[in-house]
Structure formats: structure tokens, C-alpha cells
Amino acid sequence: MKRLLIGAALLLIYSCEDTASKSIAQYDIDLFFKNISIGGGYFSSDESKLAFTSNASGIYNVYEVDINSGETSQRTQSDTESFYALSYIPNSNALLYSADKGGNEISHIYLLKEDNSTVDLTPEETEKARFFGWSKVRTCFYYQSNKRDERFFDLYKMKVDEWDPILMYENQQNLSVESVSNNERYFLLSKYTTTSTNDFYLFDNQTRALTQVSDGAGSYSSAGFSDDNTTFFFITDVGKEFAYLKSYEIESGKQEVIYESDWDVMYSYLSEKETYRVIGINEDGRTNLVILDINNDTEVNFPEIQDGSINSISISKSEEKMRLSVGSSKNPSNIYLYDMKSNRTKKLTQSLNPELNADHLVAAEVVRFSSFDGLEIPAIYYKPLQASKRNKVPALVWVHGGPGGQTRVGYYSLIQYLVNQGYAILAVNNRGSSGYGKSFYKMDDRNHGDKDLKDCIWGKKWLQEQNYIDTDKIGIIGGSY
């Protein structure tokens, strides 16, 4: 009797496995590439709309969405060139957007007027222009341009309604501008010396004094100035494995660590009224956002969102609304509105192809395995839903570009297609990858194609240890390495 019960139980288990594998819908590859890609999300002055970039038309164009009604309208009508939203013009429905020609990567800044006519604000043929944000009073915007010398980017500003370029900083020494103070007196400048180190300077545009801020070999990047122009903030990894946030008092030169984590701080900025500090952390291949209420010294808590995690935010000028970018490995990024007064969120876009069921896609997980020398290697793993001991599946080792780089948790159409078709994917973040400390990052210096490649091979060995993998069918895929 006992044997009969055990046998019946095993049959039930196998039957459930077979049923589960049969109930998973498998999709053609074109369905995965019919997802809509969405980026940006910039508030209008009255905070009633958000401008964003979307390829819903088949190519990237500028769109806007009404926050109250949720109605979306297409502002540009390109069918040949990709147009990328940059910002609304203050107190206007006009917009700035960026575009190149024929994929030549020589991007210009365009004005999209309220009547939807356009003006190229940076018209020189070989001029590459990059939007750099607005002045504090929003009467002009800043941008970088190489029109003077195509080797270097100078900093310009352009006044609204005049649209004439005004040179602010001429880059003669290959010192790139990273930030400008509100009074336009101070500039933070950077010059890279290696792939992981740079020199960092404070330039006084009034006295013409150049002060070196970097006081040790490492990485430095700007996190902006205080409103009163007395302090700036920067991110560095000097003396530590992971990047952290510091402040620097301009008059005294006093520096202070104001935030650090067990992972890299990627970026940080203050909200318009300096009520909130936003900090983005690269935590084990995921973006962890920390928003600090500076007045109360507390962390802002967000409501849970089913579609995924919050990857980036933008706080409105009134500091009453937030634009959230929300996505996961099963859902491409969408734009949400978060009302800070009511504590409510509202989904404003839909990026996943409605012909795809997210329940039949796979959530990525972070795994680790030991390489040939015992070093622990992180990886992002996708296990097919139909995989089991009785239904063994093939596998692929996924290799990201390099040197540096990192495969992160997020939505990848090709990966989801392959996993849906029954391929396990192990995206190896081999030694030399970013995000795991500067020692790990430097481990394949002058050694490309040796130890980093062995990490990928040992990733294959890890796959072979999984009892649902067909060990005779393991391949490798990737590019740009």
C-alpha cells in the first residue's frame, strides 16, 4: 500500500511538472520587440503634463501625457530620425528636444514651438550639442558644444526667446564641465587620467583660480552645488572600495562624508527647494533609490508598485509631485506619477506589449558562483519556467561588453525571448565589471581575455551543476568585448 501511495505521489508531481510546462505560452520573437521603449519624463511649468520619449510610432518621438486625464499626445511626427525629449520651455508648452541625422551621433538641440514648428538652435553642421540643464531662475538653459574645436566641449548658455549662444567656459585643457553654481561663478571640472581615475577641479570664473579638489587617485564626479553657492557635493571612491558622497565648503575647503553605503553611490542631487536629497545606489545589479528629507533627517517611503521597482525619479519644482520610472526584468520601464501629499501613485504609460503575459516571463535573480581561483563571481540568472529535472533545458552564458560594464537586473527583450523558448540565461559579471568595488573592477587590467574569460567558463560549470540543465547544450552569447 505504501509503495502504491509513493508511486501515486510521484506520478502527481511529474504530472504537475508536465502540466506547468504545457501551460506556459511561448511567443514569437517579434512580439517581444513590439514593446514600447519609454524614457525621460519632464514636468511642465504648471506641473499638469510630462514630456517623454517613446518609440510607440515605430521610431523615437517626443510625447506628452496629461497628468490628470492620462491622455497621451505625440508632439513630433518623425518617421526617419529619432527625436528625444529634453525639457519644456518655462511657462510655455514649447519643448526642447535632441536629434542627430542618419545616426551620425552629431546631436543638435531643437526648439519645438507651441505650434509644433521647429528651429535648430545649434545649426552648425559638425556641431555636437548636449543639453546641460536650466539656470536657477530658468531664463536660460546651458549646453555643451564642440563647435569651436571638435575635440573639446565648451559650455554655453542660451536665453529663452533670444536663442543666441553665449560662451561661458572655453575648454582649452580638456577639462570637462560637470556642474555650474547658481550664480555662475563656480564650475566643477574633470579630466580623466585612466578608465578608473580622474582629476577634479573647482574653477572660480571671477578670480580665474583653479583649485584641485582631488587629493588621491580615484574617481570623482559632481553632485551639484548648494542653492547659496557656498558648498558643492561630489562622489568619490578615494580610500574606499565603493563610491560615497561628500560635501566641500568652498571658502574653507572643509570636506565631509554625508552618505555612504556598502555599494556604489551612482548619483545624487537636491530637489528644487533643497527639501530632499535623491541618492541612487548600484546595489548588487539593481538601482536602490534613497530619498532623504533633509529637514527631518528621515527617509521618504514609497508605496509598493506591482510592476517592479523604482529605477529613477524626478521631483517637480513645487516638490509636491514625483515622476517615477518603474520597471523590472518582466516589465519594461513605465512612467508613474507619485503625489506626495496624497501618497498615491498613478500609472501613465503602458510599455509591455499587451500580447505578452508578464506571468509567462521570468524574474531575474542574483546568483554567485566560485571561479577557477575561488573568487566569487556575481551573475544575473534567468531560469525558464518550464525547466525541471524531467524537462532539462539548454543554457547560455551571457557576456556583457567591456572593459568595465555590468549586466543589471532589468528588462531585455532578447533575454526574455530566449528564456521563454526554454533557454536558461546566466549573465556573468566577470572580474573587471563595474559595481562590485574598485578592486574587483581592476582585476582584469592588462589581463583581458584570460581570467575574465575563465570566469565565464566557470559560469558554464555552475550551470552544469543545476539538475534541470542539459549539460551537453550550453553555449555563450554576447558582444562588444
Regions found by a protein language model. Give the residues of each.
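C-terminal motif of bacterial Sec signal peptides marking the signal peptidase cleavage site
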Residues: Y14-S15
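Short, linear, compositionally biased motifs with a strong N-terminal bias
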Residues: L10-L11, S69
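Beta-propeller blade-edge and WD-like acidic-aromatic loop motif
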Residues: S21-Q26, K49, T53-Q74, N93-A94, ...
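Non-catalytic carbohydrate-binding regions of carbohydrate-active enzymes
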Residues: F302, Q306
